[in-house]
């Protein structure tokens, strides 16, 4: 009889974990995307100030008002200066993810991540986002490999990489690895309160 209750408890715990990730997954993506866009906007605005590329700013803003933002940004990319061109690529990837075209979104972020002309900060953000929007049938080990450097190197993306990596570990059925990542996240300073609370909750739910 005890075995039956243990199985029920495990099923409930698994359902709770799935519900938490369903609830927070989109929020995580939105938060990271917002950070990337804000930083990129700052770079784009600085470029506009120094080069007086007002036409680039107008072209970008006009594309955002289009019924087909992706097509408009793709068509107008040649008019954009470096800062706005990068921002456009991030926007294209975000639009693709919003349209549930996760394969295209992942490819767009990977293109940014491999662009050596970009500041490493943006390359790292793109690499993280490529994992977060990857299709459900993507190979977990390959996704985890993209996060390995971000999880260990101090920087603005480390906490988010650890949280994302913990989710991948859960998908792979490796509860111990997931708990270890959540604990590392909890030990970090300056972790957003919401993220810390999620990590704490997951540690409790995973029974550690």
What are these regions (language model features)?
Residues 89, 94-208:
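Soluble extracytoplasmic domains of inner/organellar membrane proteins
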